Amino acid sequence: MKYQQLENLESGWKWKYLVKKHREGELITRYIEASAAQEAVDVLLSLENEPVLVNGWIDKHMNPELVNRMKQTIRARRKRHFNAEHQHTRKKSIDLEFIVWQRLAGLAQRRGKTLSETIVQLIEDAENKEKYANKMSSLKQDLQALLGKE
């Protein structure tokens, strides 16, 4: 396993995940009967500050259909948590208009690179073009100065 599991922290994430799903109207318990489901949800809500007990609630009451989705969510959250500790692995998001994203994705695909690598390459290309333009301008001025002196 690449990322260390932190039981208390992840139990808090699981609690938040389940509460969010409940508020969105999903069935988070394995019970069909509404009163039994509500009792289990009430118990879960009371466990907010008891992360160790959340895993017990999950084993006993959680809807089996949510198991894989919750595991995926927690795995992604764990990865983001550990990557955020180091500047070089921290991820940032940017908003792009769809057409811009589409063109960038097409360029990345043609170049066989990731979106991030393509953006870095475009920036480097622009910087090199700017350096070249400055150098040519400087050479042009030097040449004009030489020709003007003679």
Swiss-Prot record:
Location(s), subcellular: Cytoplasm
Keyword Lipid biosynthesis: no
Major location category of this protein: cytoplasm
Pfam families on file: MatP, MatP_C
Record-level Gene Ontology MF annotations: phospholipid binding; protein homodimerization activity; sequence-specific DNA binding
Entry keyword set: Cell cycle, Cell division, Cytoplasm, DNA-binding
Gene Ontology terms: cellular component: cytoplasm; DNA replication termination region
Phenotype of gene-disrupted mutants: Mutants grown in rich medium show severe defects in chromosome segregation and cell division.
InterPro entries for the chain: Arc_rbn_hlx_hlx, MatP, MatP_C, MatP_N, MatP_N_sf
Keyword Cell division: yes
UniProt-listed GO biological process terms: cell division; chromosome organization; chromosome segregation; protein homotetramerization; regulation of DNA-templated transcription
NCBIfam families from the UniProt entry: PRK05097.1
Quaternary data: Homodimer.
Function: Required for spatial organization of the terminus region of the chromosome (Ter macrodomain) during the cell cycle. Prevents early segregation of duplicated Ter macrodomains during cell division. Binds specifically to matS, which is a 13 bp signature motif repeated within the Ter macrodomain.
Family, similarity comment: Belongs to the MatP family.
Protein name in UniProt: Macrodomain Ter protein
